[in-house]
Amino acid sequence: VLFPSEGFSLATLITKTYTKRKQQRSDCMNYTGYLRQPHYYETDQMGIIHHSNYIRWFEEARVDWLTFLDVPYYKIEEAGIIIPVLAVTCDYKEMIRYEDQVRIEVTIDHYTGTRLEFSYHIYNQTTENLLTTGTSKHCFLDKETNRLLQLRRSHPEIHRIFSETFERQKETTND
């Protein structure tokens, strides 16, 4: 018994944790987005967020979202996988200022088991105005050999999480 006073065994704790995380993954559409308060140093001379910071914000949001799905980057890297960026786009709709709190929503636009494409939507948390959109394209490589991986074969659990999340998001988009 791990916590004797509470009557929890290690097996019960593991089962509850697994069930909770499985529910989180199945509720991927309940992810409320990554909240970000811009920092003063991210502004330019005009008092708006410098364009180079948006790509960093995309990465922060992507890392946060993957953690929510219970596949944080450190677990992916521990599994011997790296996910290099192949391409990035960013379309600026409205300026973001230092005092604006933003919400970044992340979705999987495309997934093949070897490649992955994310889309990003940045909203003003107060007004709900869409401020920026973007995408990033990635592939999965073996950390040691830098060879392309097919997750379905090499890491079926990680593949399942990405595949199921992609399918759920696709269904929601088509509704």
Predicted regions located by residue number:
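Short, Lys/Arg-enriched N-terminal segments with co-localized hydrophobic residues
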Residues: K16-C28
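HotDog/MaoC-like acyl-thioester-processing domains
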Residues: T32-Y34, R97-Y98, D109-D175
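Hydrophobic residues in beta-strands and at strand termini
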Residues: R36-Y40, Y92, F140
